[in-house]
Amino acid sequence: GALHMNELLQETLNPPESYKREFFINNTVYREGDRIMQIKNNYKIKWHRNDCPEEEGEGIFNGEMGEIAQIHEKAREITVLFDDGRFAVYSFSELGQLEHCYAITVHKSQGSEFPYCVIALAGTPSMLMTRNILYTAITRARKMVVIVGTREQIQFMAENDRQQLRFTGLKRMLENDADS
């Protein structure tokens, strides 16, 4: 899936070079220049802008993307430059909040747009082969989308209007709250 695609794309788009620092943690190589995504909210991490030093704040949020600008092995830290121009420093122990984002799932892409998208359908579980997933994937692209799959897969998705039921317990919580 996306994990394996990220490994392949990292080697193609950001291959090892003598001038790029890198390190391994949890069977993953992190390299200067790698595309990364914040995968959970961190309300406390400090950020700043180099072009406007007095502008600083706290908080990097789920779905924000950027690239590894510097790796500081002795300090066991990395500096990330986010796409909006903010810099944040992460200790190696905080890297569970980040993952590579050369390839991401449709779910993680929601709320984002990209100039170009490639939608790979091979190996997609049947429960995710729905019209709304296909629509969401296609509408992430601003300029061009390429769908890699068979006509049958695309037709199945386009015709499959089944909705995945979600059992959140929200109705029960609201009813309990109303009874209180």
Predicted features along the sequence, with ranges:
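Conserved helicase/translocase motor-coupling segment
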Residues: G1-N62
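C-terminal accessory regions
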Residues: R49-D51, E55-E58, N62-S180
